[in-house]
């Protein structure tokens, strides 16, 4: 992951190539409502305000909107997308590496062009970087433009009210 044009990502941030899975993902020893597996990302949302999560694949996949309720499910129709026209060539992608393949998912989304998954850390289509309360997606080797997406969850010391929005 080059990350060269986006200097504000701290070097201590956790980083992973976009969409790259794990050979041996960690699994908990017993069922837990906290650990849904390896495809988690930094939550979006303030303390006590509910949250939505976006994984290193780019999909929105968990949320805690109703107090005490936890849902982990890929929401394929909720995606960022990019249209680029460069040198009379159009490039269009939903910025997630795959659609929801679960039963009862929206099959019409299979027509979407999903962002290419990184083949390896060295042969990457970009990177996901996380250091709470921020995370970044840096998209590389696909678009002509340099593209990144930064998310921020509000945390203010000694100010619970603004931290809960």
Language-model features: locations:
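Beta-strand-rich N-terminal accessory domains
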Residues: 1-109
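Extended, loop-rich substrate-binding clefts of extracytoplasmic carbohydrate-active enzymes
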Residues: 101-165
């Amino acid at each position: 992951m080059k990350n060269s044009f986006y200097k504000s990502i701290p070097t201590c941030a956790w980083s992973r190539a976009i969409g790259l899975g794990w050979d041996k993902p960690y699994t908990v020893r017993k069922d837990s409502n906290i650990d849904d597996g390896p495809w988690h990302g930094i939550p979006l949302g303030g303390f006590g305000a509910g949250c939505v999560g976006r994984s290193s694949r780019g999909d929105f996949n968990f949320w805690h909107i109703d107090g005490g309720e936890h849902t982990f499910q890929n929401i394929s129709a909720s995606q960022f997308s990019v249209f680029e026209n460069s040198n009379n060539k159009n490039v269009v992608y939903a910025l997630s590496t795959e659609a929801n393949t679960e039963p009862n998912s929206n099959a019409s989304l299979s027509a979407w062009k999903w962002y290419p998954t990184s083949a390896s850390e060295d042969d990457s289509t970009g990177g996901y970087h996380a250091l709470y309360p921020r995370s970044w997606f840096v998209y590389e080797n696909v678009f002509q433009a340099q593209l990144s997406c930064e998310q921020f969850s509000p945390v203010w010391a000694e100010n619970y009210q603004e931290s809960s929005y």
